[in-house]
UniProtKB/Swiss-Prot annotation:
Binding site for substrate: N10, W11, K12, G178, S218, G239, G240
Family membership noted in the UniProt record: Belongs to the triosephosphate isomerase family.
GO BP, sorted A to Z: gluconeogenesis; glyceraldehyde-3-phosphate biosynthetic process; glycerol catabolic process; glycolytic process
Annotated GO CC locations: cytosol
PANTHER family, sorted: TRIOSEPHOSPHATE ISOMERASE
InterPro entries noted in UniProt: Aldolase_TIM, TIM_sf, TrioseP_Isoase_bac/euk, Triosephosphate_isomerase, Triosephosphate_isomerase_AS
Record protein name field: Triosephosphate isomerase
NCBIfam families attached to this UniProt entry: tim
Protein's job: Involved in the gluconeogenesis. Catalyzes stereospecifically the conversion of dihydroxyacetone phosphate (DHAP) to D-glyceraldehyde-3-phosphate (G3P).
Quaternary structure annotation from Swiss-Prot or TrEMBL: Homodimer.
SUPFAM superfamilies (UniProt xref): Triosephosphate isomerase (TIM)
Pfam families according to UniProt: TIM
Length: 261
């Protein structure tokens, strides 16, 4: 089936709420409404920017969507520093990233916690973008496919088949994040196809055919066309390139099939 591409811009820990407003305005100005019929576009700002982004998106009736970079596995309570999925839903978030390699690396998040966060996101009507990916040593040893499938199983553990159908998955080879190194389109397809095959096993072929599988890792306007042209790659989780509104809009337009805005 034909899956609508998703281009999600992960701002990471960049931009205050004033800068967030300016960036969303730039994206909205640079990417006319007609493109949104062929590509879904989302921004993933820091928590502190979400209310400002919500106000702008709602006030100007933008077709851009937005989400958060993480959430708590808990709904409420004495969890200092955590942010509840209920709060994110109230802010109008559509997506939430879980299991990003930077969370796994710097905060020691494991697959069990990622699965708990994914379940909590779904409980609150949010679409989790579940991230998996290998380090360079795993890739060089030729174990990257097996590694990603094991990580996928752990990160979706406990979800029902229909819940899996409401998830977005993102393959982000750790060695390609912020390094300028990019997996080739064929490399991305290899792992994303394996992900879809495993989703068919975990849920069903029908459900697997509907799940969007993204690629993340130094995605930009120069390489996104080749990446999304692959049969099993349905968009990109974009890092640094999402901080330039005009570049991000161009990238989204290419993913939509063009022409450039």
């Amino acid at each position: 089936m034909s899956r609508k591409p998703l281009i999600a811009g992960n701002w990471k820990m960049n931009l205050n709420h004033y800068e967030a407003i300016a960036l969303v305005q730039k994206i909205a100005f640079s990417l006319p409404d007609k493109y949104y019929d062929r590509v879904d576009v989302a921004v993933i700002p820091p928590f502190t920017d979400l209310r400002s982004v919500q106000t702008l998106v709602d006030g100007d009736k933008l077709r851009l969507t937005y989400g958060a970079q993480d959430l708590s596995p808990h709904d409420s309570g004495a969890y200092t520093g955590d942010v509840s999925g209920a709060f994110l839903a109230k802010l109008g978030c559509s997506y939430v990233v879980v299991g990003h390699s930077e969370r796994r690396t710097y905060h020691n998040e494991d697959d069990a916690l990622v699965a708990a966060k994914a379940a909590t996101a779904l409980k609150h009507g949010l679409t989790p973008i579940v991230c998996i990916g290998e380090h360079l040593d795993v890739r060089e040893a030729g174990n990257h496919v097996a590694h990603n499938i094991e990580q996928l199983r752990g990160s979706l553990a406990g979800l029902l088949a229909e819940q899996i159908g409401s998830v977005v998955t993102a393959y982000e080879p750790v060695w390609a994040i912020g390094t300028g190194r990019v997996a080739s389109a064929a490399d991305a397809q290899e792992v994303c196809a394996a992900i879809r095959k495993e989703l068919a096993s975990l849920a069903s072929p029908r459900i697997a055919d509907t799940v969007r599988v993204l690629y993340g890792g130094s995605v930009n306007a120069k390489n996104v066309g080749d990446i999304v042209a692959q049969d099993d790659v349905d968009g990109g989780l974009v890092g640094g390139a999402s901080l330039d509104g005009e570049h991000f809009a161009t990238l989204a337009a290419i993913a939509a099939g063009g022409p450039l805005p």
